Amino acid sequence: MLRFPILLTNDDGINSPGLQHLASSLHSLGHPIAILAPLTEQSAVGMKLTLRDDMAFEEHTDIAEKIRTDESAPLRVFSLDGSPCDCVIVAIDGGLRSWAPEIRPWLCISGINRGPNLSIDVLHSGTVSAAREASLYLSLIHI
């Protein structure tokens, strides 16, 4: 049974084991999954946006095949050479419509984070910032 589609991101990068375990677990429950995560580690960047530079985009079919658990639910894995907030904005503001039209996310999950996000440090966290950015977009899409 297919469930609601989920966008996953993080600040630890596309090769993060936590991100891949989370994707595999949610996919095994039948959720269509789209991952758009930073190409490289982006911890403690807060809500940084890339405004004046081009960002490289890449699909990772090798990672998708490694974490795929349900053949009936779509799973697409992408990286962006940008911040976690860049990833969320690009994904929700048209990127996924172009690259993965079969996945229209209803929810964005950011994590699993490699380290702790505690106390005032959450203000610097790329993981928390990506979730905050997603809340600005997803709440408008599904009203």
Segments from the language model and where they lie:
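Conserved acidic residues
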Residues: 106-107
